[in-house]
Amino acid sequence: MPDPARARRLAKRINTIVASAIEFEIKDPGLDGVTIVDTKVTADLHDATVFYTVMGRTLDDEPDYGAAAAALERAKGALRTMVGAGTGVRFTPTLTFTRDTTSDSVARMDELLARARAADADLARVRSGAKPAGEADPYRESGSGVEPGRDGSIGDDDQPEY
C-alpha cells in the first residue's frame, strides 16, 4: 500500500542529500551554479525526480543548461550511492534530473500581465474621451417625471397577467 507521507519524507531527505553533495562533495565545475529546487518520489519509492535550476556566473551571463545536465548525468551514480547511504531504505530510488522551468513560466506570466496592463491603459485612454452614440437615455419621455409601464399606462398594475 503506497504511503504518500513516507514518499514526501523520502523526497525531502533526497533533496537535502543531493543538494549538500553537489555543494560540498562533488567537485565537478559543470555543477557550479546548480541549485536543487525540489524532489518528487513515486508512491512505490522506486523513482525520484530531482528538479534543478542553473544560475549564470554573473547577472548578465546566460546559464549553461547543457553543461549542468551533462554534469548531473556524470554524477548520477555517485549521488545515488550517497542517497542510498543517507536514507537507509531497502531500495535506493533511481534518480532522474529535470530542469525546473518555474522561473521561465513566471517570467512569461509577468510579460503577459504587463501586456494586459498596457492594453487596459490604452482602453481606458480611449474610453475617457468616448461619448454615448445618441441621447443618454433614448427611452425616457421628456417632461414626465414618471416612467410609463409596459403597456404605456402609468400605475402599479404592471404585473404580468396569468
UniProtKB/Swiss-Prot annotation:
Main location class: cytoplasm
Keywords: Cytoplasm, Ribosome biogenesis
Cell compartment(s), UniProt: Cytoplasm
GO annotation (BP), single: maturation of SSU-rRNA
Coiled-coil parts of chain: none
UniProt xrefs under Gene3D superfamilies: 3.30.300.20
Pfam family, one: RBFA
InterPro entries: KH_dom-like_a/b, RbfA, RbfA_dom_sf, Ribosome-bd_factorA_CS
MF GO annotations: ribosomal small subunit binding
Region (Disordered), start-end ranges: 124-162
Cellular component, GO, one term: cytosol
Subunit structure: Monomer. Binds 30S ribosomal subunits, but not 50S ribosomal subunits or 70S ribosomes.
Function, as annotated: One of several proteins that assist in the late maturation steps of the functional core of the 30S ribosomal subunit. Associates with free 30S ribosomal subunits (but not with 30S subunits that are part of 70S ribosomes or polysomes). Required for efficient processing of 16S rRNA. May interact with the 5'-terminal helix region of 16S rRNA.
NCBIfam families: rbfA
Identification of the protein by name: Ribosome-binding factor A
Lineage, highest ranks first: Bacteria, Bacillati, Actinomycetota, Actinomycetes, Mycobacteriales
Gene: rbfA
